[in-house]
Amino acid sequence: MNMYWFLGALLYFLIGTYIFIRVTRDSQSGSWILLALAAPLIIAGYPYFYSKKLLSKRR
């Protein structure tokens, strides 16, 4: 089960990074800049808080 969780987190990170790069390169739409700035926090923060939630349930 841990291997599947690791692969899922890796896939989530790669997709998030790809979207971040695509949004950053699209300089024509100004409304996406806020998402591009927030993307690293979302990409790094979601797995952290989700894993923290899972670990707190086990105790």
Curated annotation (Swiss-Prot):
Its main location: membrane. Keywords: Cell membrane, Membrane, Transmembrane, Transmembrane helix. The chain crosses the membrane at residues 1-21, 30-50. It comes from the Bacteria. The keyword Transmembrane applies. It is found in: Cell membrane. One of its GO terms (cellular component) is plasma membrane. It is a multi-pass membrane protein. This is Uncharacterized membrane protein YdzP.
